[in-house]
């Protein structure tokens, strides 16, 4: 295999010198004149670079003949089809147009004007302003149950188990009193009186912003419940979502618990590394995780020239060591919004441990995206992989069925607690047999009128993703 570090000039030479992709053209060649000045512009170079990316990495580019082999076909053509995927200013509208010709709803482009916000949404958990702690009523006392790492409460020295007695000299008698008392703006000062080991203390805390945690631990009728909101690189923990999960799992193991409920309801996914590592924490050394069939590229000799061709690599992840939670009995909660990376975790654990699932059929997204920066500083997300379980099966477009189909959220939790308490039930359901409808043609696009370029929209468009190292 050749070194995969191509300059934009190399890509241009390969693209203009000969037909580098062996697919049939899906529209006629461009008839408009493209001047030398056009070709030297950053806008044309960005189009050319993204054409290479789609040709190399987009899973269906050649399998379904979706991408025209001539990048000039797309230059300065403002397509009207589905501009809800990604975001472009007028200068890069043809790049968005090219991406929007691909049928896959998760293959999208954001031009340089949006790139900072896009990367922040993909890599960081939401920011909050406050002290950064969770509380609960334990034995009629209001107690800190979690102090978020790198939060104002963390730096003020507060610890789990501290008993709250007053906030700003106001006696706290309920959780509602506490929540009201700690409200404020960034840089406001809050004084919290608390008891630790029978001694009274006061913490002076300046409210500030911090990355919210994505993993939460609570107990229901004596059963530990880990709720994972999303899988993200930068959170309250320096190691992201996986770091949070590992810490909470260690607490459960240290506590001697035998069963665990993992709540993945409304978890739309995130960075694949985190759901794979979290899965490995629950498995034994050598057990199979996900298998990825991934589109990539290679250069081959064609006469006196090099030719770039798309190919598909298959890789499988394994648990490299015994996970700290390998002996735990696990029950999952899932629903129709459980998607992508959270479905990978469900797939990994249920295929290895036959862990039961309570809730509703999941979303059914068994494909993955590669994200990275482009030549001009934009951001691309390209569907480049299909995902399979240890047996070579996929839930894509059909979802993962629950063992207990229950619609009411409270009843879902009650059933999960019942199963976890007994700790004997094995999974008997499988993947869905009927399409969830989420990948039907009519469901492929979101209304551009309704689109708001916010964090939720960006992460819905990403799902399960990895950050790629590509040509530069």
Residue map of PLM features:
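Second-shell loop/turn segments in exported
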Residues: 32-39, 78-86, 149-152, 166-167, ...
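Extended, small/polar residue-biased N-terminal targeting/export presequences
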Residues: 55-139, 178, 189-190, 197-212, ...
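BRCT (BRCA1 C-terminal) domain core and associated BRCT-interaction motifs
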Residues: 357-397, 402, 410
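Bacterial N-terminal signal peptides that target proteins for export
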Residues: 2-10
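Cleft-lining beta-strand/loop regions that shape enzyme active-site pockets
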Residues: 182-375
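Conserved PDZ fold ligand-binding element
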Residues: 153-176, 261-263, 392
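Mobile, glycine-rich extracellular loop/lid and propeptide segments
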Residues: 134, 145-159
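Bacterial Sec-dependent N-terminal signal peptides
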Residues: 17-44
């Amino acid at each position: 295999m050749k070194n995969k570090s191509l300059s934009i000039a190399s890509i241009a030479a390969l693209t203009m010198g000969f037909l580098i992709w062996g697919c049939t053209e899906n529209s006629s060649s461009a008839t408009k004149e493209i001047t030398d000045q056009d070709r030297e512009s950053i806008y044309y170079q960005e189009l050319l670079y993204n054409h290479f990316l789609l040709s190399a990495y987009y899973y269906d580019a050649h399998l379904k003949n979706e991408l025209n082999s001539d990048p000039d076909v797309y230059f300065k053509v403002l397509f009207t089809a589905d501009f809800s995927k990604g975001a472009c200013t007028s200068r890069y509208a043809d790049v968005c147009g090219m991406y929007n010709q691909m049928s896959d709803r998760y293959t999208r482009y954001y031009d340089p004007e949006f790139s900072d916000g896009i990367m922040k949404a993909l890599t960081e958990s939401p920011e909050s302003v406050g002290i950064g702690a969770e509380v609960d009523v334990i034995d009629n006392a209001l107690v800190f149950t979690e102090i978020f790492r790198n939060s104002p409460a963390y730096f003020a020295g507060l610890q789990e188990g501290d008993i709250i007695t007053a906030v700003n000299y106001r006696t706290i008698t309920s959780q509602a009193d506490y929540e009201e008392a700690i409200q404020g703006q960034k840089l406001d000062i809050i004084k919290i009186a608390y008891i630790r080991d029978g001694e009274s203390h006061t913490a002076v805390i300046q409210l500030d912003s911090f990355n919210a945690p994505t993993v939460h631990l609570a107990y229901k009728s004596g059963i530990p419940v880990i709720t994972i909101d999303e899988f993200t690189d930068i959170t309250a923990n320096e190691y992201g979502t996986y770091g949070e999960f590992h810490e909470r799992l260690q607490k459960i193991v240290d506590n001697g618990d035998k069963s665990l409920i993992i709540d993945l309801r409304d978890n739309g996914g995130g960075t694949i590394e985190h759901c794979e590592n979290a899965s490995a924490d629950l498995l034994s050394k050598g057990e199979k995780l996900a298998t990825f069939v991934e589109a990539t590229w290679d250069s081959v000799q064609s006469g006196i020239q090099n030719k770039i061709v798309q190919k598909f690599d298959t890789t499988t992840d394994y648990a490299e060591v015994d996970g700290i939670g390998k002996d735990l009995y696990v029950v999952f909660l899932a629903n129709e919004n459980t998607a992508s990376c959270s479905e990978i975790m469900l797939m990994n654990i249920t295929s290895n441990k036959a862990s039961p699932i309570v809730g509703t059929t999941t979303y059914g997204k068994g494909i993955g995206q590669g994200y990275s920066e482009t030549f001009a500083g934009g951001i691309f997300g390209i569907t480049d992989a299909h995902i399979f379980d240890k047996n070579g099966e996929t839930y894509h477009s059909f979802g993962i069925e629950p063992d207990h189909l229950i619609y009411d959220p409270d009843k879902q939790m009650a059933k999960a607690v019942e199963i976890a308490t007994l700790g004997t039930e094995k999974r008997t359901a499988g993947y869905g047999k009927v399409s969830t409808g989420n990948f039907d043609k009519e469901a492929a696009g979101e209304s551009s009128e309704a689109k708001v370029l916010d964090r939720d929209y960006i992460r819905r468009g990403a799902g399960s993703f990895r950050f790629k190292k590509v040509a530069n």
